[in-house]
Amino acid sequence: MQVADKTVVIAGLGVSGTSLAEVLRERGAHVIGVDERKPEADLRSFDDVDWDHVDYVMSSPVFNPRTPFVLEAQRRGIPVMSEVEFAWQLRVNNERTGTPAPWIGITGTNGKTSTTEMTSEMLTACGLDAPTAGNIASGDMSMSLSRCATNPQHDVLCVELSSFQLHFTDSLALDCAAITNIADDHLDWHGGRENYAADKSKVFHNAKHAIVYNAQDAKVSELAAEAQTAEGCRKVGFTLEAPQAGQIGIEDGWIVDRSGVAGGAVGEPVRLAAITDFTHLAEPDGSLYPHLVADALTALALVLGLGADRDTALKALTSFKPGGHRIETVAEAVVEGGSVRFVDDSKATNGHAARASLSSFPAKSVIWIAGGLAKGSRFEDLVKDQAHTIKAAVIIGKDQQPMIEAFASQAPDIPVTIIDPEDNDTVMDRAVEACGTYAAAGDIVLMAPACASMDQFKSYADRGNRFAAAAKTWSEVHGLH
């Protein structure tokens, strides 16, 4: 892609927009940054853009496809692209191979980040410079996707891709790609369920070596079956059950591959590792977190699909530690008869992720902190499905009504405490105190809110950090010493 002397409008000067602006300027482009909140922006309003002289637009995920400036650019025939599309078209040759570094792309409603991190860790253990990039939150502009794509030292890029980014991306031809799952999320942004799925499916288009899909998700399986990939590209389904031919899964306590990606013939069972080796994906009693096991299977299939050394990759995967705010025990209070454990899963920002989190625990053992910015979601199905696990619920957030209504209609016998949303600074302290009134030995206080965090917190990480602090304080005050 030649951008010298081209005029590019950057819509939104967050980390990715600012980084891309720098990359484009270094290549001789004339960049116009538009952001009403950033003093360094060239313009504060799209009304001030001289569209007659614009060649390209980079749109931030904050702007949906029906935003007026997007429609105006498209009306004029100006390409509207994501940072991902720009990065793909600007990528440079690796200094050792003389060709662009392979990209492994991971998308899905949930599980993207853990899968991307596992993939990177295994490839790094194999001696490759394989950073994570893309939708993974980072304030480091040197590791933005546009910077990584134009760095000749990287051997592989492990790219987390959101549906927002994929909407304005059209030319990707990934080396390996995965869709972890698809559930209703961001439907208002995309304009419906089918549009959302169609944007997710772009990771499979023209993939070269392997596409990895959730064989237990009917929609993802459909997208994989329909995917138009390069000749010879392997399609690998992952399952938490015994795998069929073409799949990788769990059989008799072992990770077993029947897809051929681990070196055997398609349909031939190849035992890779005992599931008991993955203690980091399990409860203290050894019971596995199903969604983290699914992420591990996905990542393993991706790196083997790229041709990584199997034994080295498996060794790295068995020592992988999930990142913060993902089903992480942050405090434990000794009480009469046992203990109460506090688990932070703040990254569970939608109902699908919260369901996976809740389903990891025994019946009637969870005091659930739920709520936040619902984004138009309804929770009746979630509450009905997980009522057997929930002992009590504590509802936070400014958008509480959807969660309140779900409990009233689907689980009226479960006690619910509603936290006054007025004081953001103390909301988590009050929520944890309320949980303490329900908790007894053997219980789990689980913060997996099923909602976004921006109504009362800076981010899901801020929400998780405040929960951890409140949990530790409660444990010190109320625990037996």
Curated annotation (Swiss-Prot):
Superkingdom, natural source: Bacteria
GO biological process: cell division; cell wall organization; peptidoglycan biosynthetic process; regulation of cell shape
Localisation: Cytoplasm
Main location: cytoplasm
GO CC aspect terms: cytoplasm
Any GO molecular function: UDP-N-acetylmuramoylalanine-D-glutamate ligase activity
Presence of the UniProt keyword Protein biosynthesis in the record: no
Record SUPFAM superfamilies: MurCD N-terminal domain, MurD-like peptide ligases, catalytic domain, MurD-like peptide ligases, peptide-binding domain
Top-level EC class: ligase
EC numbers for this chain: 6.3.2.9
Positions contributing to ATP binding: G108, T109, N110, G111, K112, T113, S114
Keywords of the record: ATP-binding, Cell cycle, Cell division, Cell shape, Cell wall biogenesis/degradation, Cytoplasm, Ligase, Nucleotide-binding, Peptidoglycan synthesis
Catalytic activity: UDP-N-acetyl-alpha-D-muramoyl-L-alanine + D-glutamate + ATP = UDP-N-acetyl-alpha-D-muramoyl-L-alanyl-D-glutamate + ADP + phosphate + H(+)
InterPro entries xref list: Mur-like_cat_sf, Mur_ligase_C, Mur_ligase_C_dom_sf, Mur_ligase_cen, MurD
Keyword Thylakoid in annotation: no
Pathway assigned in UniProt: Cell wall biogenesis; peptidoglycan biosynthesis
NCBIfam families: murD
Function: Cell wall formation. Catalyzes the addition of glutamate to the nucleotide precursor UDP-N-acetylmuramoyl-L-alanine (UMA).
Family statement drawn from the similarity comment of this UniProt entry: Belongs to the MurCDEF family.
UniProt protein name: UDP-N-acetylmuramoylalanine--D-glutamate ligase
